[in-house]
């Protein structure tokens, strides 16, 4: 039986980021070549049905997969200039519509938070975190992080996904330009376990 945590939650985003970096390294041209990352999404299970055979009912783990992809796109924004999510409504989508009713899936919330909070310049960040190893990947940091800075608002946004399915991780946030002495706001997507 497949281990969903290892094969999808950890491996798929790590592989995607590795492929983006490999594409950048293989470009030995004097011109920049950019990537459009098309039709990405969390799609881990398929439910049978009469109408929507490709429909997904997402859980917290899927929302965290979406957040990891958004972190990847911020970290690699020098090369990934466009990233199109596969499907936005109903089939493998963050929103579902049934007649005149709309409901938001778990994968909607990371999209909402990134779209409404991440502005300005993506920051190059350094992460020191406990790590996880799979058969294919060694030393995958449990903390998956991206950050942005909006100079006009003097605002730093830090996006963190804890990949550890069993433990909370305490982290220190340090800045090379001084301490953070302003008000901070936290938006948290969380649950008792990832399969909710």
Model-derived segments and their meaning:
Residues 1-69, 127-139:
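Noncatalytic carbohydrate-binding groove/subsite architecture in carbohydrate-active enzymes
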Residues 19-31, 72-81, 117, 178-180:
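Secondary-structure transition/capping motifs at alpha-helix termini
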Residues 41-47, 89-95, 133-134, 165-168, ...:
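Flexible loop/turn segments at secondary-structure boundaries
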Residues 140-180, 186:
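Carbohydrate-binding surface patches
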Residues 16, 39, 83, 111, ...:
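Conserved, mostly hydrophobic/aromatic
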